């Protein structure tokens, strides 16, 4: 990514997940914004921002946060919305276990209340410890939680897999959570 791309990518994430009104726009029911509208809005803060810049940011984003529709006339975040959108995801069977990385400061609450989606549409889970670790390190002293997704699924909990391979569900009860050691 170019020097400013990381900063612009974070701003695009804010717009596409939480605050499209920052640039005077509104997401459609599926979370999409018109690409030309987004570029015009971004040009208020980032003069000269173009379709080439947007395509590069989407292509080079290591987390795969964004996707275009087929003709690249619209763009959306693949998950992480605090705004209600229908991503059109089908419920599917998850792996036997999934993982959630978090900070030590949140463990007491999680072990009391479970994993809750808070301001997001879904709880985010990872298929492997490595990915959960990357996510969890942002929250301070890292703790990895193992989630018994097989039992959750058997108990009727629905799981979804986002386009960028983040596992999503509405809630994880305490009984399905186990703290694991990284030794």
Curated annotation (Swiss-Prot):
Family: Belongs to the KptA/TPT1 family.
Protein's UniProt keywords contain NAD: yes
Pfam families: PTS_2-RNA
Matching SUPFAM superfamilies: ADP-ribosylation
NCBIfam families assigned: PRK00819.1-4 (NF002014)
UniProt keywords, alphabetically: NAD, Transferase
Single Gene Ontology BP annotation: tRNA splicing, via endonucleolytic cleavage and ligation
Gene3D superfamilies to which the protein is assigned, alphabetical: 3.20.170.30, RNA 2'-phosphotransferase, Tpt1/KptA family, N-terminal domain
Gene from which this protein is expressed: kptA
Name used for this protein in its record: Probable RNA 2'-phosphotransferase
Record bears the keyword NAD: yes
Organism for this UniProt entry: Clostridium perfringens (strain 13 / Type A)
InterPro entries: Ptrans_KptA/Tpt1, RNA_2'-PTrans_C, RNA_2'-PTrans_KptA, RNA_2'-PTrans_N
EC number(s) per entry: 2.7.1.-
Main function: Removes the 2'-phosphate from RNA via an intermediate in which the phosphate is ADP-ribosylated by NAD followed by a presumed transesterification to release the RNA and generate ADP-ribose 1''-2''-cyclic phosphate (APPR>P). May function as an ADP-ribosylase.
UniProt GO molecular function: NAD+ poly-ADP-ribosyltransferase activity; tRNA 2'-phosphotransferase activity
